[in-house]
UniProtKB/Swiss-Prot annotation:
Transmembrane segments: none annotated. It comes from Oryza sativa subsp. japonica (Rice). CDD domains: GRX_GRXh_1_2_like. NCBIfam families: GlrX-like_plant (TIGR02189). Keywords: Cytoplasm, Disulfide bond, Electron transport, Nucleus, Redox-active center, Transport. The lineage of its organism: Eukaryota, Viridiplantae, Streptophyta, Embryophyta, Tracheophyta. GO terms for cellular component: cytoplasm; nucleus. Has a glutathione-disulfide oxidoreductase activity in the presence of NADPH and glutathione reductase. Reduces low molecular weight disulfides and proteins. This is Glutaredoxin-C10. The keyword ATP-binding does not apply.
């Protein structure tokens, strides 16, 4: 979907979430609160086209097959990184901060 691609490239870090999603809140808190990233956060449950975008994200996250959890979906430098498990794994492995720096999302 063209809208997902357009929104995903609007900033160095873009997070697609839902307002009632605990894992979405955890990922957003990590990126924005703990790491200080100026991410664009899109709450799809508040967007009239959110359901269509969530389906597209599920397709991308699950290898084209759809199904499974679509949110949160995190893009860094316009590229899909993945969901909560992937972001947390990268952070614990020490790989998230360098990725964010390379995308221009962190300066320190």
């Amino acid at each position: 979907m063209e809208r997902v691609a357009k929104l995903a490239s609007e900033r160095a870090v873009v997070v697609f979430t839902a307002s009632n999603c605990g894992m979405c809140h955890a990922v957003t808190s990590l990126l924005v609160g703990e790491l200080g990233v100026n991410a664009a956060v899109h709450e799809l449950d508040k967007d009239p086209r959110g359901r269509d975008m969530e389906r597209e994200l599920a397709r991308r996250l699950n290898g084209g097959g759809g199904g499974g959890r679509a949110l949160p979906a995190v893009f860094v430098g316009g590229n899909l990184v993945g969901g909560a498990n992937r972001v947390m794994s990268l952070h614990l492995a020490g790989e998230l901060v360098p990725m964010l720096k390379n995308a221009g999302a962190l300066w320190l």
